Amino acid sequence: MMKKTKVIVLAENALTTPGKLVRYINTLNQPVIVKETCFGAYIEGEEELVDKLAQEIRNYERNRIFCKDRGYAIWDKRRCRAFRGGGPREGFHQLEAEQAVLDKIGLALDKIDKEGIKPMEEVLAKENELIKRETKIPVEEFKNIIEKVLGSKNEA
């Protein structure tokens, strides 16, 4: 069987902490390696088990816990800071940027859970309406509005 490592990332608005996440994963009593990180955790084990476990972990706090595959084992000397003398590892800043938007993605997923997926035509029609509302008005029309407003104030 192939080994697999997954990155488990908590959205900023998650109620779960990395420590609580790791304790939860350990209560599942599965033969995987778990490592706590500042953004969540890593899990490593047999490929099928890790994929199944990742889905179960995501359901622990739906739309606030996200997973992605990691290309290196947990203690891989090419990536682990303990072997490289500290500092951020390659890819950390990308992961940090991804984590920054997960709360918004989670809220969007909550809305889909609540309202379902709307037809694309409906979404585009609403978006076009918003764009029309934000379209700039011609200068002459703006001048007329100003004259009306100021004129009514001067008359009062």
Curated annotation (Swiss-Prot):
Q: Can you tell which superkingdom this protein's organism belongs to? A: Archaea
Family annotation (NCBIfam families): methan_mark_6
What protein does this entry describe? Uncharacterized protein MJ0498
Q: Which organism is it from?
A: Methanocaldococcus jannaschii (strain ATCC 43067 / DSM 2661 / JAL-1 / JCM 10045 / NBRC 100440) (Methanococcus jannaschii)
